[in-house]
Every structure is written in C-alpha cells, then in structure tokens.
Amino acid sequence: MAVISLMFLAVMYVVHHPLMVSDRMDLDTLARSRQLEKRMSEEMRQLEMEFEERSRAAEQKQKVENFWRGDTSSDQLVLGKKDMGWPFQAGGQDGGPLGWILGNLWNAGLFCLFLIFELLRQSMQHEPAFESSSEEEEEEIRVVPVSSYTRLSDFPSQEALEAFYKHYIQNAIRDLPCTCEFVESFVDDLIEACRVLSRREAHPQLEDCLGFGAAFEKWGTLHETQNFDVLVPIVPPQGTMFILEMRDPALGRRCGCVKVDSECMCKHEKLLGDVLCLVHHRDHSAMLSKCTSSIKAALCTSSHLDVCKTVQWFRNMVSNAWALVAHKYDFKLTFPPSTTSCKLRLGYRSGRSLSISLVLGVQREDTLVYLVSQAPEQEQLTSVDWPESFAACEHLFLKLVGRFAPENTCHLKCLQIVLSLQDHQILPPGASRPILTSYHFKTALMHLLLRLPLTDWQHSMLSLRLQDLLWFLGRGLQQRSLHHFLIGNTYLPLTIPIPKAFRNAEPVNLFQHLVLNPVAHSQAVEEFHNLLAQVKTLPCSPVAGGL
C-alpha cells in the first residue's frame, strides 16, 4: 500500500508539474501554474470539507443505530472506525497507538517529500522571462499589473478625448498609410537600380529596405510624420567580411566600429590536416585582397568603415540610380546635404513635398539590432563610430502587438494625443530644446503594453490608459529612472531577436542624464506639468469631472 501511494504521488506530480523546456520559466507558464495551484488548493479544501461532513454524518448515523440496538460502546466504535483508515492497519483490527503514530509519520513523510519537490520547482522560477512557445501564447503576454495610484482629477472624458483625436490628429494623418507604402516602394525601386549599377563593383551590397519610426509604426502626429526614415542594410561583397567591434557601454555610448577584412574560414576555425585555404593561398589571395583593398581605400579609415565616406558613396549611387528610374515618377528629386544619411526631397507640382532619410545599417549577428550611420543629435561620435539602433526591434514589437491585440485598440491613440499636445508646448524660458522626447513617451508605452493585458487597451479604455501612460512617465521623472525597453528587460518576448547578452544585462536608465544634471531635471518636470495642464484643458472639447 505504501508503494502504491508513493507511485500515485509521483504520477500526480509529473502530471501537474511537467518538465520545463529551459532553466527559466516564462511569465505565461508561471501565471498559469499559479492559477492551477490556486484552483487545486480550492478543490482540495472543498473535498476536505465534504469528507468531514460525510464523516460526521456517518458517525451520527452509527451512533443512532447503536443506540437503538442498545450498544453502550457506540462512541468507541465510531472512533475506532475513524482510526482504521490508515494504511498500516489491516482488516478490521485496531492498530493501537503505534499504528496511529506510524500512519501519521508516513503521511508526514509524504507531505515533506511533496513540499521538497515544490520548493525545488519554485527555486527554478527566480528569473522570470517571456518565452512565447506558440503563436497562440503570444496573444497572452501581459500579466504584470501596474501599481494602483490615485486617478487624476478633472481628466477629460472618453468623448472629449475622441473628439480631440478626430479633430486634430485623425484628419491630419488620414493618407499616412498610403504614403508609407509609396515611400517603401520608391526606395525599393532606387535600391534595385543601385544593384544594377554596382553589379561589377567591389562595394558593399544593398539589401531590402525597412521603414521605421513614427510614420511607419502608425503612432506619429502631423509633426512626427513630416520625415520618413528608411533603413537600408548593407552587407560585404563576396570575399570580404564585416567584423563588428563594439565599444564598452560603460563609457556611456552604445556604438561600435565596422572593420573590413578578407573573409576566410581559417580566421574562424582551425583547419584540420593539409586543407588548403583558398583566400590566403597565393593563387587566390591577390584577387580577394584587391577587392578588400578597394573597399578600404574608398570607404574606410584605418580598416574601419567611415560613416561620412560610406554615406557619400551611397548618395552618389542613389543619384545615378535616380537617372534610371526618373521617367516613372512625376516629381522632382533633390538631395539635401547630410553626412550621416542620404536625404531625399520629393517635390510635386502641387507644392507638396516629402522628406526621406535613407539610413545605412550593418546587422549585428542574427538579430534586428543594427549599427547605423545616423546618430542621435546629442551624441558626438567619431567618423568610424556607428551608433547602435533598436528601431527594427521596436518596430517588430509594435507590429506583434497590433497583430494579437483586439481590434480598434487605443494604445497608439494615447501616444498620438500626448505627442500632439507636446508639439504645441511652449518651452520654458532659457531652454533650447525639450528634455522629454517622443522616444521617452514611446518607451513608457511599450513598458505598459508588457505590464497590462492587451484586453485592457480596448477602445472604451482610452481615458484610463492615457492616465496610466502619464502616471508611468511621471513616476519615472520623480525617480529619475526610465529603463530602456530592450536592454535588461526580462519580460521581453523571445520572438524579438536581440543579442542574448542584452536580456541578462543591467537595465539602461534613459533618465541618467537627469540624475547628473538637476537643471535638466527641473526643466523635464516643468514640461511634464505643462503637459498635464494641456491634457486637462483639451482645446475644442469639454472637460468631464474627475474619474
């Protein structure tokens, strides 16, 4: 009987606690396991209550029967039946005190064994991480609740926010999806013409473009969608390879250098036996070294890709490619000066114009992280430093949210309303530019998308979610802390391809400069308070009472 009990316990443990696929349990599985444990505990409690009720009923019935039979030892018989339930008692004989003690020891041992297994399982959950094992599970990737807080008073109602959005935002970006589609199609046409021109040249090859930023991610306002940013990845030609040499992030700059070298397996692996290295063999090295030398002479500074030289080479190629495709389009194309990107300006006869920035990028490993040619305005880098960009990763995340979220969600509307008000904000005296940027608000929104279920972003919850967004950023300003969305974020879905080291890295504080500069922090706080005042008094819309 003891062996059967032990086997049953082992089987039940395997059924309810299956082996995990890795040493870290994802957040969805953790939530479901806790719900299952809670449900099992409630069911066990209910069964215990039912068992006790039945035992008391049987005891009472036995007492009544014994009383009518005239049995004066009814209480002892009933108690004896209760003691006979332990595995160490055989037949109808009473095991006595020793049997009762052994029975309790056996059950206590089983309980301790089960408790040890449970503690071991819990110890494997100390580092939760998002791991979507299927497309069905990706839809349920937000389970961490946002801390409760006091709702803002005099906040606009749902109707007021909708009226503001339709009047100031929706009409202004009505044609944005069609414009984005045209921009990508036009850039693809230019890239294809560039490939034709560079077919016989030993220069970097161009891959398919990727639109990113406010316009392509559908959260931009009229101001944010005046410029269209397009990423154009480049890869080395045959016989040449790019070696990425990353700078130390502790220095405060996330960038790297792109070293150009001859491609050869002997630089990656130790060749066995007398295997011939075709690159370094004297019969082939001359041709391949000529290819590498050509790139170094034209585009490099000390064997590293020079941003300015590479952009100028790309700009000249696009200019030549335009001559091949100009007959297809009815606008005038000009090239505004720039040293970090190839800027295009499309001028139509109607007076309308479009501005496009073609940003070159070198892919980091097999991820969506790129070293790009265009640096943020506040960073001063050398000509061989290529800043690290996570734009493609963030674009994919928002695309996944749009795919699995319910129809007509309000997450993009929240960001658009805030940015639209910020565009019309007057800077504090003495300030040359705002401290709070659209990227800060976008980062706060993406954090909230991970912390709240997608069902909480329905159309009817616009007012609540907008308050959540403002509260999240306001708390970050108060604490001088806003973590980067991708670096050190253990809740990030594994479907977002980033370097493995980024998931286990220390979070990067986007407000670190506010810690070091109290004046900048004061300006950021003032900008935030002005934004709150703007939200509470939306133009051309009534204000409702506090929520």
From Swiss-Prot:
Location(s) in or outside the cell: Cell membrane
Gene symbol of the encoding locus: Itpripl1
Organism from which the protein derives: Mus musculus
UniProt cross-references to Pfam families, sorted A to Z: Mab-21_C
GO molecular function: receptor ligand activity
Protein family membership: Belongs to the ITPRIP family.
Lineage: superkingdom: Eukaryota
Transmembrane segments: 97-117
Cytoplasmic side: 118-547
Protein name: Inositol 1,4,5-trisphosphate receptor-interacting protein-like 1
Gene3D superfamilies named among the record's database cross-references: 1.10.1410.40
UniProt topology in membrane: Single-pass type I membrane protein
